[in-house]
A protein has these predicted regions:
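Acidic/aromatic-lined carbohydrate-recognition and catalytic surfaces
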Residues: 1-200
């Protein structure tokens, strides 16, 4: 608002993570038309990491990355994912038990559950190309239910993506409200196409 700008475009607004490389920066290859990109996580708005050594490590990395003349897309996104994993281990159980999360989950489950399962399997098998996965490579309701069962080992990784999307949803809502209060509109882009190896 101070620079007289009225529209701020964010690309990619949707998650495009397939390879964890710079090629994921292409905004028109989203893996979900609903999931927000983890690159938008604002750590200043999150709880502090309790482990002092880890907190110091991430602060040093933040300063190093912010001092670069150009954004290092891969390192920034990988650092943000690692930071979110630390916070999930620290805060995740309480967050997922909260009434705010439950309300978010009830509204978003139709896309959040398959997205989170896809992300967990992508990491497990090291590729977004689900046709090459040894299992879960075809839609199967029984397999989906097993991945969503909190008593299974797979659920912990699936729930991490629930946590990340909840955090991003809340932060984006706050950023949107702040921008609107200053007369600025946040603009994404309509994902008319999705990555052929995406969750959707």
């Amino acid at each position: 608002a101070m620079t007289q700008q009225r529209v701020l475009q964010l690309l990619p607004i949707n998650d495009t993570t397939t390879t964890h490389t710079w090629t994921d920066s292409y905004p028109y290859s989203s893996i979900s038309i609903f999931a927000l990109h983890p690159q938008f996580a604002d750590f200043n708005a999150l709880p502090q990491i309790e482990d002092e050594a880890l907190r110091s490590k991430f602060e040093s990395l933040r300063q190093e990355l912010n001092a670069l003349p150009k954004i290092d897309y891969e390192r920034v996104n990988n650092a943000k994912t690692e930071y979110l994993q630390v916070l999930y281990r620290q805060e995740g159980k309480a967050v997922l038990a909260s009434s705010d999360f439950k309300a978010f989950f009830d509204e978003a489950a139709h896309w959040l559950v398959p997205y989170a399962q896809y992300c967990a399997l992508r990491e497990q098998y090291g590729t977004a190309d689900f046709a090459t996965w040894p299992d879960h490579n075809h839609f199967d309701e029984a397999e989906r239910k097993a991945l969503s069962n909190p008593r299974t080992a797979a659920y912990k990784q699936v729930a991490f993506y629930y946590y990340v999307q909840f955090v991003l949803n809340r932060q984006m809502a706050d950023a949107h409200a702040y921008a609107r209060s200053k007369g600025v509109v946040l603009k994404g882009d309509i994902p008319i196409g999705v990555d052929r190896h995406g969750a959707d």
